[in-house]
Amino acid sequence: MTPPNNPNHPLLVFRPAHERFRSALDWLESWHSFSFAEHHDPNWMGFGPLRVINDDTISAGRGFGMHSHRDMEIITVMIEGELHHQDSAGNHGVIRAGDVQRMSAGTGIMHSEINESEQACRLLQIWIEPSQQGLPPAYEQRKIALTKQQWIPVLDPNDHTAMAVARPIQLWRLQLAKGESIQLPGLGSPMAWIQLLNGDISISSETKASPSELHRGDGLGFRPNQARFSRIQSLSNQTDLLMFDLS
């Protein structure tokens, strides 16, 4: 198989949820779409600049102690519950469901992520390689107002309602009820990735590309100008997904 982060990657790269790497501790369940920590597979080192997608569930009262990052754009999308963040730059606060946090590690930053609540929390942590290394660390957190059946910008360097990272990529979040459908957003880059947070969808393609359905935890990388997916429809009562336009 051609590694998905190779410039000559195939038309479609399908990552079924059950084939992801799984880490399990007494306080953490983590599903890794790409190689991470002790899980290393040269065929799954990332997809273009998209280096990490981890689906983490953290038990109440537990979390990650202080640890360091460098030269990586780190995005945390809270799906359920809340998480307390603190870092070496003096930033601290609680990230709640619906919030998105952006942390540019740059020349180096240390941070902790602790679930101080009485309920488990679930989040998606995303790592994106920056276009330039050695930038100063930066931090931002926003509440993303979600409207069903609408692509909501999360990352977009040209949209003041969204955040931006040190790479010209776009990221949208979409929620659909059962039977609702929507056209894909305009994808201007040669690579795109869909990640299902919850629910099930069908995807229409002018080229009859497969798979035609995605389910919770599935990921799909594709070339927009060749796969030519046109429309997404929800097959479940509550569908929640992310769409990346990767440069």
Regions found by a protein language model. Give the residues of each.
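Jelly-roll (double-stranded beta-helix
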Residues: 1-247
